[in-house]
Amino acid sequence: MKYHRPRRGSLAFSPRKRAKSIVPRIRAWPECDRVRMQGFAGYKAGMTHVVMIDDRKNSPTYGEEVVVPVTVIETPPMKVAAVRVYKKTQYGMQIAAEVWSNNLDDFLDRRLNLPKKEPDVEKLKAAVENGASEVRVVTYTQPYLITGVPKKVPDVMEHRIGGNVEEALDYAISKLGKEISVSEVFDEGAIIDVIAVTKGKGFQGPVKRWGVITLDAKHARSSKHRRVGNLGPWNPHHVRWTVPQAGQMGFHQRTEYNKRLIKIGENGEEITPKGGFLHYGVIRTQYVLVTGSVPGPVKRLIRMRDAIRPPKAHFDGVNIVYVSTTSKQGR
């Protein structure tokens, strides 16, 4: 039993304020020898469960059928809007050169000003010759290809290209202004990290926000029940930031590590349950199944990235026996 418990929540995530953008920001990328985009994005459709053969070598149920909860993420193809080349400086990574495509969708004009010039890829190659160390692409989603998300404005984000700089640049230039599908980025059975903005809960009190204990009947008689018993000592003459208080709860960017991508599907109707996913509907394009839950509500943008600290566990290979498509409406 824990005797000292001033709060249940972690102070590591303070200040608990709303995320700056609903498009999550990825600040670190793992090294990769394969020339490909190291991340992708999709929209959360809902959850279901699958029956699969347990392929973890040291698992007690190895070789047996197990039921695994999965999240369904619809992943329409993404388009490459620009190629960026970065160089290392004493102030961190800085853009050495940038080239935008002139073959972009009109819907992107609602998000940013579209370029009019022809792309000049020679300055990208010159930047690499001058010591640039990393290649990234500016990509955007195509929500107008799906029906579960009621918007047409794309979400713009940046992804790193793996491999050495020369090969990564050639690959990025070949994809400029073209589509990239999720099957070109990830393989079935891959270990990934999931980054998203959590469900927003609004302004909540300290009991729900921090899990502090409610006060006893003596305090309740003076209408003081769901609050903190003490704001701190007389000295210092201010309330410390560690004191659990009311405030914003939810709508924070969070990263969940080491999820397993167990299926990449082309036909969305094969995974759509009877009656469609609640508050989402029918899946129209490509989709992926990710083990466990992911942050955020239905329709939330979910970013996926190569696992930055993958587990040492060994997996034989994904073998799915059954995918549940029963109605999620409770009937």
Curated annotation (Swiss-Prot):
GO BP field: translation
Domain of life: Archaea
Family matches, as PROSITE patterns: RIBOSOMAL_L3
Keyword list, A-Z: Ribonucleoprotein, Ribosomal protein, RNA-binding, rRNA-binding
Subunit (UniProt): Part of the 50S ribosomal subunit. Forms a cluster with proteins L14 and L24e.
Family, as annotated: Belongs to the universal ribosomal protein uL3 family.
Protein name: Large ribosomal subunit protein uL3
